[in-house]
Structures are given as C-alpha cells and as structure tokens.
C-alpha cells in the first residue's frame, strides 16, 4: 500500500481512540492494518532537495515525486524559478530498483502528461 509520513499522526490518533480534525492531509492507515490488501490512497508524494544542504541553506534543485502502485514519476525543478530541469519515470512492476528511466520514451509521454498534472495538483497545489 502507498503510505506517507504524514499518515502516521492520523493512524496513531485512531489507534489511541483520539479525535482528529477533518483538515489533516494524512490518512489513517488503520484500514491497511486490518486488511493489508486494502488501499487508503491512490498516490504518495515525496520531495527531495539537491544538493541536500544542512539546515539554513537553499537547495539548487528540488525533486517532486508522485508514486502510484505501478510508477514513480519525478520532476527535478530549479528551486529559484520552478523550471523543470529533468524528469524520471520508473515502472515498479518491472523495475523495482529504478535502474531504467523511461521518461524519454515516446510511448510513455501520455502517461507522463497525466502524472505531471496530478503531481501539480497534489504536490504543487496548482490547477490545470
């Protein structure tokens, strides 16, 4: 199942029987604990700075990834202006170790376009 660190708080509060607010970004993972084949979300988002500077320094590039059950798509963006500098696409069904970047394959461009829109709407909070 796809999970994110922000799912930890709602999971722990539910397990402890505590109330939460409806505006939490995370989702409780209790349904997965009860039925491991169940899903609670269709995507997971990650963000990775490059280079990975210590606290207080500005990164040059930020990687924004969206992970589905099958794919991980990443846009490497200039931190200052948001321009996309590179893209990665990996098919975890056939390439779980992410050895072959599929982002430049013509037959994957439609998939990439859809994942890019979903990434913008979720991680970057814009509407297309």
Write out the residue ranges for each language-model feature.
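Intrinsic disorder/low-complexity segments
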Residues: 45, 104, 114-117, 124
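C-terminal cap/loop subdomain of S1 sulfatases and analogous C-terminal strand-loop tails that border
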Residues: 6-9, 14-92, 110, 122-128
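A short acidic/glycine-rich loop-to-helix N-cap element
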Residues: 100-106
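A short, structured beta-strand-centered segment in the mid-to-C-terminal lobe
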Residues: 1-5
């Amino acid at each position: 199942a796809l999970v994110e660190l922000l799912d930890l708080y709602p999971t722990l509060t539910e397990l402890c029987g505590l109330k939460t607010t409806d505006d939490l970004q995370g989702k409780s993972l209790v349904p997965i604990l009860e039925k491991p084949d169940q899903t609670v979300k269709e995507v997971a988002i990650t963000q990775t700075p490059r280079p990975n500077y210590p606290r207080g320094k500005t990164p040059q590039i930020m990687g924004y990834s969206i992970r589905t059950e099958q794919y991980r798509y990443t846009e490497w963006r200039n931190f200052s202006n948001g321009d996309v500098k590179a893209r990665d696409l990996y098919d975890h069904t056939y390439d779980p170790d992410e050895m072959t970047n599929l982002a430049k394959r013509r037959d994957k461009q439609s998939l990439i376009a859809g994942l890019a829109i979903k990434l913008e709407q979720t991680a970057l909070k814009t509407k297309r």
